[in-house]
């Protein structure tokens, strides 16, 4: 089976968030037994890991968007995946000068790329075309209008239903969509407005989200009734599939960045397991200038944005200071009031012996924190899937979370973590934190049971890939 994915980011080459990681993991697992290709835009200024000698083939691709255009397809293989980068030769201003993946003109840029991607897929053929998020929503309509050779199914995965790709009718008129297919993207209440996600929902054969609970939650999203109508119309062809994580890379037994390696097997002797965690904690505290004592360590490894619950993060800081345990927050935070507030907190707590805020991100440091921490706090307002709770469990770090989306699917209160429900109740959140801290301090038997359940949790890439294959083959 030939499976072609298209998106605007792919972690080994370029990424801005979880979409790139999720696509990489899925494609890697599918490539073991199937011909798998990923088609993304070429961002010359942003690629850092790609060298010209890696490219094994090029071809010219004519496409239509705001007139007759031409693209060049560059391809190479990465871990069994054919990666194709499309360079829009006739419209170089759209991607070649981009300093970031996302800009102020994303709808037009991504529609131009989608037109080129659809033309490439029509030429190359595919059994399954798998689209990722609204950015490539136009591909669905173009391939329905003019299917590629041997096309059996178009699958759309919603990594974040909150982003939808609102744009003008004029942008879609620049493509070769006829009036019938263009109407799938239009809003009835405002025919001059189109929504790339809306059209993709109607033009795809099957829709998935990245967790079962999130699939249920989006059916209750009434923020735009026309988008609600579109997702409701597809509810019998909608399924939530939990993302997997790469256990070959995320493995505390072999992770080269840890001060002390350890494994699930080591937990047969809990004392030895926790001693290994303690060695990692000691090394991390020395790096961050924290005071080492017997108090628990909680971490937050997350973008600091509205979705991630910044007000709860601030409550966690207060709770840590009041209850004398360590809290480490690491994550990027871009502009606005949230950035200002957390920058002030970072500065005011710079000399705190037990709270550290790092407004940056390092994969190496993140793994060292996973290995050292006793708990990871994830107080998201919504969370389509979430990977950090699964990585935490892999490293024997107990998740304390809000029960939403993929967090609700992976963390059971009192079994393999702790959870709260109300997205507006600080009291419930603080009670959950107190319960987790008290369990660690006062009930070691219960704590060991919870850590054991974390280590026994499994959500690997192969399991997720097999569920997608079931959809492909239906």
Curated annotation (Swiss-Prot):
GO terms for molecular function: alpha-1,4-glucan glucosyltransferase (ADP-glucose donor) activity; alpha-1,4-glucan glucosyltransferase (UDP-glucose donor) activity. ADP-alpha-D-glucose binds at residue 15. GO terms for biological process: glycogen biosynthetic process. Disulfide bonds: none annotated. InterPro entries: Glyco_trans_1, GS/SS, Starch_synth_cat_dom. Keywords: Glycogen biosynthesis, Glycosyltransferase, Transferase. The keyword Cytoplasm does not apply. It catalyses: [(1->4)-alpha-D-glucosyl](n) + ADP-alpha-D-glucose = [(1->4)-alpha-D-glucosyl](n+1) + ADP + H(+). It comes from the Bacteria. It is an enzyme of class 2 (transferase). Its EC number is 2.4.1.21. Pathway: Glycan biosynthesis; glycogen biosynthesis. Transmembrane segments: none annotated. It holds the Pfam family Glycos_transf_1. Belongs to the glycosyltransferase 1 family. Bacterial/plant glycogen synthase subfamily. NCBIfam families: glgA (TIGR02095), PRK00654.2-3 (NF001904). HAMAP family: Glycogen_synth. Synthesizes alpha-1,4-glucan chains using ADP-glucose. PANTHER family: GLYCOGEN SYNTHASE 2-RELATED, PTHR46083. This is Glycogen synthase. It comes from Chlamydia muridarum (strain MoPn / Nigg).
